[in-house]
């Protein structure tokens, strides 16, 4: 499935292909989302800060492989009727995503602080909120919680600011990522895992937090937060 998801980026250029290849093979969150069967089969998903659409490409490839009868028998079935939507503020990445996805997902050029979330089943924010000031983080989370349908899922990944050395490595990686977007001197706004959980729970979400840095020197945590029915 990772090979199929990467293949679509060849037409978008070598850098886009290499980036997708590296993310899908070395970032544990993509494997976890499919292997754990976290996503619903139907409804709608919005990936905020989707970049060049790697997660969307993975979900599209998984759906196609399942339809062709080539899905691993020991894995949970992937979403087959989940409408996919991505949002990113970087024009170049949006262009790459649209080319790679070839109509398999709706990808919009917009600042996530201003986007119309619309009612949805799943909201994904991977390594996104640390680039926003704390007040902005809270406003985005408030909008996200409101947009989620009852029983809906918010998938949030952020670094744990209490993780000492691993946190410094994660910040360095985030700064380098910002540099590739031409944002030299970007200030990061991080919280401890406990503070992230508390912030989500204050909005009525039931939160499960799990480390999401296997095979890396980082201290990322995946927060699986569900809106109570």
Task: Describe these PLM feature segments.
Residues 124:
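A conserved beta-strand element that flanks and buttresses the S-adenosyl-L-methionine
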Residues 1-44, 52-116, 153-229:
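Class I (Rossmann-like) S-adenosyl-L-methionine-dependent methyltransferase catalytic domain
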Residues 133-134:
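Helix-capping/helix-break motifs at membrane-protein junctions
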Residues 127-128:
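Short catalytic micro-motifs in class I SAM-dependent methyltransferases
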Residues 48:
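Conserved beta-strand/loop positions that form the S-adenosyl-L-methionine
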Residues 138-150:
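A short glycine-rich, Lys/Arg-flanked "PGG" loop and its adjoining helix->strand segment in the class I
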């Amino acid at each position: 499935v990772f090979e199929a998801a990467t293949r679509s980026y060849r037409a978008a250029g070598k850098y886009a292909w290499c980036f997708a290849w590296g993310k899908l093979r070395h970032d544990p969150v993509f494997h976890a989302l499919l292997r754990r069967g976290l996503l619903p089969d139907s409804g709608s998903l919005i990936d905020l800060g989707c970049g060049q659409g790697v997660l969307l490409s993975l979900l599209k490839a998984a759906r196609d492989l399942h339809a062709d009868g080539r899905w691993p028998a020991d894995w949970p079935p992937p979403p087959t009727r989940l409408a996919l939507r991505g949002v990113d503020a970087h024009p170049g990445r949006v262009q790459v995503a649209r080319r790679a996805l070839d109509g398999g997902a709706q990808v919009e050029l917009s600042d996530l602080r201003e986007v119309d979330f619309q009612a949805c089943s799943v909201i994904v924010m991977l390594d996104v909120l640390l680039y926003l000031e704390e007040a902005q983080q809270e406003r985005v989370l408030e909008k996200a919680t409101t947009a989620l349908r009852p029983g809906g899922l918010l998938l949030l990944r952020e670094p744990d600011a209490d993780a000492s050395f691993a946190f410094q490595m994660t910040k360095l990686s985030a700064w380098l990522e910002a540099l590739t977007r031409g944002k030299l001197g970007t200030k990061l706004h991080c919280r401890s895992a406990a503070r992230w959980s508390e912030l989500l729970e204050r909005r009525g979400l039931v939160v499960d937090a799990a480390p999401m840095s296997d095979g890396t020197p980082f201290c990322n945590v995946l927060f699986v937060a569900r809106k109570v029915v």
